[in-house]
């Protein structure tokens, strides 16, 4: 039996140390035992494909985990050029991470096709959001929700360390639901 796949290009973007690679490993590789003791910054993009079934339709996910450092922004444009779905990551305990996600979103929006689906992912939700003592670094939940609403983003929380599969699956299901709705409208 031959299966026809609908191919979806999914790109993971966000600032350095925002958890893209661990999310990638959980989503694509289904790693249960992740090592969090030693952070190593990614210095190149990673690619894997994953076959899934959603609402009885086969999909092939082409998943790109991009590099988060600002010096690679000019290269990142290539990845979201033909993306169907873009996940934008920030971490809760850093206002700078959220500002970086905003900047990256603007770059992705300019350089992507008009029907791309964007999802903002607040990562490391298990960590204390108020762990930084300086007031300037603490994120305001209202600011995040305002950004989500203003830009019509799908929003979700992710915790790779604690119950990671629930957060990742919930975000992914929201995005796939939106993706299939958009595809139905195009095909009618």
What are these regions (language model features)?
Residues 1-188:
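TRAFAC-class small GTPase G-domain
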